């Protein structure tokens, strides 16, 4: 199972891909120029780790709370990938994980299953 995790809700854009049992991560500044090329950052990240969007089984995206622009852009990309590539996605918030402490990004797929996060449902949490 190959999982992609995207978090653009904070001051960094965080990407993680779990390929079998291997975990690869990177981060970028959360800036307007990076929002405009987020899909390029994702594609380059996957290529660097010898995979592609076609090999991703599930995508997990942080729905907030956090940056409106970051959440909006990451959700738009994930929704587009769902429509064009038929990749299921899960919109999580660290608030969903019921006081689980020290949550690592690689734990997100297991926690989404544990807390029954619904697939292909977008309910963003924006900070005012």
Identify the residue ranges that each predicted region occupies.
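Oxyanion-binding and handling regions
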Residues: 1-40, 88-128
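DPxDG-like acidic metal-binding loop motif
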Residues: 58-63, 69-87
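Short acidic/glycine-rich loop or secondary-structure boundary segments that cap or lie
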Residues: 14, 68-69
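Phosphate-handling active-site elements
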Residues: 50-54, 82-94
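Short, active-site-adjacent cap segments at secondary-structure transitions
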Residues: 67-68, 98
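Short glycine-rich anion-binding loops that position phosphate/pyrophosphate groups of nucleotides
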Residues: 11, 64-65
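Phosphate/pyrophosphate-binding loops at sites that engage ATP/ADP/AMP, CoA/4′-phosphopantetheine
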Residues: 42-58
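Short, residue-level hotspots on alpha-helical faces of the histone-fold
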Residues: 40, 44, 79-80
